[in-house]
Amino acid sequence: MSAFSLSDLERIVAKRAAASPDESWTAKLVAAGQERAAKKLGEEAVEAVIAAIAQDRDGLKNEAADLLYHLLVVLKIADIPLSDVFAELERRTGQTGLAEKAARPTP
């Protein structure tokens, strides 16, 4: 098994985002802006859901990879480092799911 991590992918996304949009899909997506990147993230999420419902293991694996990649692109555009997401996950693990949800502000 590879030691590849989400942090590795975050570094790859950052490097590719700095490239020319003519040479990099990531740079092209970043140049298109957050709305386009977020729509692409949503498309990938729907495709992952469809694969999960269909019990398509290979499809779900592939769509999950696409989903993680596009999430990191959206985070890059928003200037939110993965370490901030990890910190939030760590904070939440100190509570039960019900307690964490109850502590959230209501919209």
UniProtKB/Swiss-Prot annotation:
The species this protein was found in: Agrobacterium fabrum (strain C58 / ATCC 33970) (Agrobacterium tumefaciens (strain C58))
Gene symbol of the encoding locus: hisE
Protein name in the entry: Phosphoribosyl-ATP pyrophosphatase
Single GO biological process annotation from the record: L-histidine biosynthetic process
Keyword Transcription regulation: no
Main location: cytoplasm
Cellular component per GO, a single term: cytoplasm
UniProt keywords, alphabetically: Amino-acid biosynthesis, ATP-binding, Cytoplasm, Histidine biosynthesis, Hydrolase, Nucleotide-binding
EC number: 3.6.1.31
Stored NCBIfam families: histidine_hisI, PRK00400.1-5
Annotated family: Belongs to the PRA-PH family.
Enzymatic reactions: 1-(5-phospho-beta-D-ribosyl)-ATP + H2O = 1-(5-phospho-beta-D-ribosyl)-5'-AMP + diphosphate + H(+)
Coiled coil: none
